Amino acid sequence: MKPFAMLFLAAVLYSGFVFPRPMQQTEADAERYIIECEGQWAASSASGDTTALQRFLADDFLGVDPDGSMYNKEGAISETKTGPKTFVSNHTNEVNVRFYGDTAVAQGSESWERRSGQPRYGRYVWTDTWVRRDGNWQIVAAEDVEVAEKAPTK
């Protein structure tokens, strides 16, 4: 009986190394990740880099632009990559994240400067809904509202 118990214990311990379980992410880690991703999304509208968007926008993502038009993941990536580069810069300001189990709601704002046109400076206030699927946080829904902002003082 003892050899069987030792063999069983060895098999259990070995399986933990061969088939590691996903690392449990703390809420603080998830919050940092979400805030970082929100910053990458804002920056991508000026840079055209869609690498981060491809990772954190869910395949079934659906967003609403300030003008009320709806867009999906494919549209967001296409517009960011090949659309006109409207913004010189775009960066997040504050981002607040609240968790509800495997769902998180991120609310924040970002400030931008256009290459041309009016208004030259502005701000988006937004709400993004994140869902944890298979251990990965992804945005499933987004809504943006455009608000006026004064030109920065230099």
Predicted regions and their residues:
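Bacterial N-terminal signal peptides
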Residues: 6-16
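A beta-strand edge to alpha-helix "cap/lid" segment located at domain peripheries
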Residues: 17-154
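Positively charged n-region of N-terminal signal peptides that target proteins for export
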Residues: 1-5
